[in-house]
Structures are given as C-alpha cells and as structure tokens.
Regions:
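Hydrophobic h-region of N-terminal signal peptides that target proteins for export
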Residues: 9-18
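Sequence context surrounding c-type heme c attachment/ligation sites in exported
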Residues: 21-25, 29, 33, 79-177
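N-terminal secretory signal peptides
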Residues: 20-92
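Intrinsically disordered, low-complexity serine/threonine-rich segments
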Residues: 9, 70-73, 97
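Bacterial N-terminal signal peptides that target proteins for export
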Residues: 1-6
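Short linear sequence elements within intrinsically disordered, low-complexity coil regions
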Residues: 11, 37, 61, 133-136
Length: 177
C-alpha cells in the first residue's frame, strides 16, 4: 500500500513539473489566447461579421485554400504585429466555393502575434495559436492546447517550420525580425 501511495505521489509530482515546464498550452497561454480572440473579434478578423479577402491556394499543414491578414492588435496594453490565417478545406475546394460559403469550409484559424520584447527572444517573440472556427483552442494529439510557444524545441511544428524564414513568415518580407 505504501509503495502505491509513493508511486502515485511521484507520478503527480512529475506531471506537475512537466506541466510547469511546458513551452505551450498552459492556462496562461489559453487565457492570453482568449484575450487575443476578443481583440480579433473587435478587428473583425474572426467571428460574426468578419471581413474576407480573395482566397488563395495553400499547403499543409495549413488549409488548401487560405485567407491571410496582416494588421496590428493590442493585448494587455501591448501592441504587436498580428497575422491571421484562415485555413479552408477540404482538398479540392475552390476559391469560388470558399467565397460562396466560407463558414462551411473554414477548418481552423492560425495566428501569429508578436508579443512584448523578451517573451520568446529565441523566436522573435511570436505567440502562436491555432483556433477552431468557434474560437476554442485546437489541441495536438497529446491533448495539449495549441497556444503559446507551440512546439518550441521540436523538430516539427509552428516554430520549427517558420524559423526557416528570417522573419518567420513566408508571405510578407515587409515585417522585419
């Protein structure tokens, strides 16, 4: 019995340490992502009445048809670059189909927001989020919410892929590191 209690206590301590060390998906990340969603609603980047652009062809892991917006947003008193990418599908969907019924084809919304200096200096202070169309956070297969320093230090994922560009963007050279 004592061995089982010790094992459970050890497992709980390890889980707590891992949760505290997680580079993304924390309660603080989720709260910040919720604040960011509210800002994007005010800017009409998401939600009812969101503005639209002409969709263009994309590639995985984003949608096969995309809309991308570059603007600024202010979260908790900090104003930073805000990039909102709407990811549409399924494979074979056309720009005309997306324009006719965007809500039927929207799979997710991926966002990069440049936070305050020092947030993540290794990765130009970008905050990464993947939302479902209703504003809830998407999760990876392990159940971690995709908000914060998503996949920091991993061989694949948001940061690993985007670090292949000097400014972490593949669509706009006007935003400097």
């Amino acid at each position: 019995m004592t061995k089982h209690i010790f094992a459970l206590a050890l497992a709980a301590a390890a889980a707590t340490a891992n949760a505290q060390d997680a580079p993304f998906g924390t309660e603080a990340d989720a709260a910040y992502a919720a604040d960011l969603w509210s800002v994007m609603e005010e800017l009409r980047m998401v939600g009812a009445g969101m503005i639209h652009a002409i969709p263009y062809e994309g590639i995985e892991p984003h949608g096969l048809m995309l809309e991308t917006f570059f603007t600024e947003g202010t979260v908790d008193g900090h104003t930073g670059t805000l990039i909102v990418k709407r990811n549409y599908g399924p494979a074979g969907v056309s720009a005309d189909e997306v324009q006719a019924a965007p809500e039927e084809h929207l799979g997710s919304i991926t966002v990069m927001f440049r936070r305050e200096q020092g947030y993540d200096a290794d990765n130009q202070d970008w905050f990464w989020v993947k939302y479902l169309p209703d504003g809830t956070l998407d999760q990876n297969p392990a159940g971690m919410q995709l908000a914060g320093r998503v996949a920091k230090g991993a061989d694949a994922g948001c940061i690993a892929c985007h670090s292949g560009s000097d400014n972490y963007l593949f669509t706009n050279a006007a935003i400097t590191p």
